[in-house]
Design a protein with these regions (language model features):
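N-terminal small/polar loop signature for handling phosphorylated ligands or for N-terminal nucleophile
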Residues: 44-107, 206-245
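An N-terminal, well-structured beta->alpha segment
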Residues: 1-60, 67, 149-190, 198
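Short, glycine-/Ser/Thr-/acidic-enriched flexible segments
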Residues: 7-9, 14-16, 50, 78-79, ...
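Residue-level preference for alpha-helix termini and adjacent loops
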Residues: 1, 6, 10, 17, ...
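Gly/Ser/Thr-enriched, mixed-charge loops and adjacent short helices
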Residues: 108-241
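Alpha-helix capping at helix-to-loop junctions
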Residues: 36, 89, 134-138
Length: 245
């Protein structure tokens, strides 16, 4: 069922699983909601490293485009905070992140965000859920070809300037008055693991620009991998997830 956290479930066939049909139906319902509440609506879309993420993003973007909702899409994997930033930075009506957060590898999900970049409210979730329930999963979903929508301009890649503004905003919130050069002189050593997710580039970029350069990244968990081979349950609150670090 669709709630404030959107959808989440195991990958597979069926209406209670994550697949192109359930993603498509959810997107149609979200598009109907956005069209009912905004003039010329738009969305930002991102995905993490989970399996089928790119497929679900292309599916969602094509459906939004078919419904007159302009889709701004991150061309590479991106963590949730960068999606929230893009919604606000680009002035979007909403956002979607294809992610199952810290669930095991068999899962994926579809999180919806409001125009403020925050998770949708219970009222919005109820309205979107009603729109989804009224949509036939096979015949009620409008779609176009993703590449055709991209060529037409109904889908737009999010460029690196958006991420650069995000990095700048994060760095501006530093509680330290030290410059990056001063920080670099301090004996700071840090161990970091992205847990095979999306954090490597944004986390190390911000840390290095802040002056923290002695960063050891756990090699087995450095690269994005939807199978999470060294960390079946990628939740940093679970002790086992941090053992290699």
């Amino acid at each position: 069922s669709f709630g404030t956290a959107g959808l989440r479930g195991t990958l597979g066939a069926g209406t209670n699983r994550m697949n192109v049909y359930t993603v498509g139906r959810a997107t149609q319902g979200f598009a109907d909601y956005l069209n009912a509440h905004f003039e010329n609506p738009s969305v930002a879309i991102a995905r993490d490293s989970r399996n089928n993420g790119e497929l679900f993003v292309r599916t969602a973007a094509a459906i939004f485009a078919a419904n007159g909702v302009h889709a701004y899409v991150y061309p590479r994997i991106s963590p949730v905070p960068t999606l929230s930033w893009a919604v606000r930075d680009l002035g979007c009506s909403g956002g979607v992140c294809v992610t199952a957060s810290h669930n095991p590898a068999a899962y994926n999900g579809y999180k919806a965000y409001a125009s403020d970049g925050c998770q949708i409210t219970s009222e919005a979730a109820a309205a979107i859920s009603a729109a989804i329930e009224s949509t036939d999963i096979f015949s009620g979903v409008k779609s176009v070809d993703f590449d055709a929508a991209l060529a037409k301009g109904d889908v737009t890649w999010i460029d690196d300037a958006v991420l650069e503004r995000y990095y700048g905003a994060v760095l501006s919130k530093s509680v330290s008055n030290l410059s990056a050069d001063e920080v670099a002189k301090a004996p700071l050593k840090l161990v970091y693991s992205p847990l095979n997710g999306t954090g490597l580039v944004p986390v190390t970029t911000v840390l290095e620009r802040a002056g923290v350069t002695d960063i050891t990244v756990v090699p087995e968990q450095r690269d994005p991998d939807g199978d999470f081979p060294t960390c079946p349950y990628p939740n940093p609150e679970i002790r086992e997830a941090m053992q290699k670090g």
